[in-house]
Amino acid sequence: MKKLVIATIMAAVMMPANAQKKGGHGYPITPVEFTKVKVTDSFWGQRLKASREVTIPLAFSKCEETGRYTNFEKAANPSESYKVGGLSFDDTDVYKTIEGASYSLQTYSDKRLVQYIDSVLDIVAKAQEPDGYLYTSRTMNPKHPHEWAGDKRWSKEE
């Protein structure tokens, strides 16, 4: 399951790169894959370094601190005793942080970050329902989901 989640995230990350127009007849510019670019100038290089060293770790620590992972842990073991709190879209903070860290890993190797992402993906994968559905605000307490979730799956798609 973890491999499926990783493959899905990587596919989503790589799709925009594959969708770019390739250089060819009448098109003077050939796109470069972002994994082939090394930004080292003093302006953007420093910002990418700050993202890697400060922003990504801070974002993951905020996910821990604010209970984002707890929602997934509860969804992995649903119970009517769980009171669904917070915002129904809190899960996206976890997904976007994984996405940002994954982009960073494409250009800067970091074994500790890979291990940490794997540990988060373990938590996320355990929260998925057997058919792959995942919405912690509904899954952690299916009989009493978050008020914005609707009475059944897909009932509030708008």
Regions found by a protein language model. Give the residues of each.
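Hydrophobic h-region of N-terminal signal peptides that target proteins for export
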Residues: 9-18
